[in-house]
Structure formats: C-alpha cells, structure tokens
C-alpha cells in the first residue's frame, strides 16, 4: 500500500527537515502495498539505480548491499508466491470439492484463502518493480496491485475476527450456534467483509497512480493538501481499524472461550464432539496468533514512521523489508497450518496429492449421485445399463 505518496510541494530532497518526503521508497511497495503505508512501489536506490554522487544523491553510498538485498527479496517473494498461490488454491479447491468440508468455519477459511491468494499474486509485479527500480506496468496495474493489498489486509483481519466470534458462539453459546453457524450465513458474512473492506479498497484504487521521479516511475498514492495530514491519517486509521480493534475483539473472544473451556469439562454431552470442538478452536487460535505475529511488526513500524523521523540506514532498510516480507509470508503459512492442525484438511490434501483407489471410487460415486440429482432420466438409464451389465457378467461367468 503506498505508504508514502510524494507530496506535490516537495522541492528539495536534501532538506534534512523533511526526510520523510524524499526518503527512498522501500521496495515493492512499502506497505506495498505493504509499502504503500510508508512509501511507493519503486525504489530509486534499487540495484539498477543511477548514483548521482555528491551530497544531493538520494541513495545511500554505492557500497550498500542493494544487489544482495534485491536478490534476497526476489528469492523470498518467489517462494512466498509459489507456496502461497498453490497452497491457498488447494485450500479453496478441497472446500469446494468435498461436501464434508463445507462447514461454517471452512467457509471463512475459504474467504481467508481467497484474500491470501490475491495478495501473493501481486508479488511477481513487486519483485520486478524492486529489481528494476521503476514501475513498468502502467497506471491500471498500479491501481489494482495497491488496492489488492489493502483489500487483503482488511478482509483477512475481518475474516479472522469473524472466525473468532464464530468460535466464541460455538463454545459459549452452543444452542444459539445451531441457528447462527450455518454455511449460508457464513457466506453472507464473507460478502459483508468484502463490502466493508471496499470502504478503504475503492478509495485507495482511485488514489493510486504512477509518477515520474528522478528518472524512474513510482506506483504511489496521491493525497490532497496538506499531504502529510491525509497520509498520516490513512496510516493511523489503518492501524486502528485493521489491527488494534480486531485484535482487541479477538482477544476478548478467546479470553471468554478459555474461561468457558476451563470451567466446563463437557460442552456438548459427547466426548467426540467436544474433542472436535476444542481441536477446531485450537486451529483457529493458532491461525489468529500467527497472523498477529506476522503483521504486528509492519503495523508498528508504519505508525512509528508516521510519528517520528527515522534516519535512512542500511539496518533501517533491511528491517523494513523484513517487516514487509513477514507480512506477506503469512499468506502462505495458513495452508501449512491447516495441513498440520486439521485432520480433515490433511486427509483432503493427501487425497489430492496422492489419490488412492478408494478416493477415486468415492469421487466417481459422488459424481454419479450428483448426476442422479441433476438428471433423473439419465440416472434411470444408468441403472438399467448397470443391471444389464450385471446380467451379462452372470451369463458369461465360468461355471464352478
């Protein structure tokens, strides 16, 4: 997300009193879109920079490990992109493919996987952007990439917040959960989360644009005057509504759930149901905890840079990119967590990767049952054909 749109009135990039307006962009997008909360997507000090030399050069000394940083970032982004896209699409596939996976919790997981898949799909653009030190993809893709990052940030945390409330209802109010926790309601809530996220995603899409700066093209956000006010207001709003408030809601929900689980030995009257309930609750808790761990550094970093001037050093640049990479890494971790923490996901992943004869037979029978429901006349024909084949086999079978 373009963290640092360049103010229109910035005139002297050597002015020590205004370093935030001239500091080099953090790479693939400071909040890039992670980077868009603190910088544009283009890094004038990237590996292909033009070092003007002298005190007025916006780049650090030539000896800085920009090429090593670029290679490391591209390698990390490539891994996150491949694992994230494959893993999240696999999660969505098994939820759509297997009827037993269409539970309320898994519908929320589908929404989370969709947001993560969209976010990881932007990484190739960001890698090229950082390597070239300019944004070569045009204004339309600039708008799409930046808005996807904001959509992912808000939709992911809203979905995790919804999952925590859903777990709270399942554990603390099991009777009410029977009416509320349905796949249909979960789909409606998912749509609402995307609509609410549009409150920030759509404005950001209109604000995103490309600008020429120092011989390169930046993919950045533009703000009205005074620029510093609207830019910092955006950062603070994102920090509050996409991090602080959801984390507080999640903390309260899990605090109440822990008290409930400690005070009651059996929640549903069945040991098996209780075991599944606790297992799912534990899985959601781990997913939420990993999300908070991965996203806390970038949120803290951005809010500090909005309030305090941080000198541009190699350590600052490396730590900034580490925070960005950590945020994107979360998008590829969730499928791994599901595979280790949920037996149903683990079984479905195994059947997808290594199909067994029994699994293939189950899939074929499921297709036949679906065709039976959709085409009754065809189903009757299939039944007659099967009956004729059975008679033929009986007639041609060797005598004992």
From Swiss-Prot:
PTM annotation (Phosphoserine): residues: 365, 377
Which cysteines does the record link by disulfide bonds?
Answer: 142-219
Q: Where is this motif: NPxxY?
A: 334-338
Q: Known Pfam families for this protein?
A: 7tm_1
Instruction: Print the keywords alphabetically.
Output: Cell membrane, Cell projection, Disulfide bond, Endosome, G-protein coupled receptor, Glycoprotein, Lipoprotein, Membrane, Palmitate, Phosphoprotein, Receptor, Transducer, Transmembrane, Transmembrane helix, Ubl conjugation
Example GO CC term: the record gives: perikaryon
Q: What is the name attached to this protein's record?
A: Mu-type opioid receptor
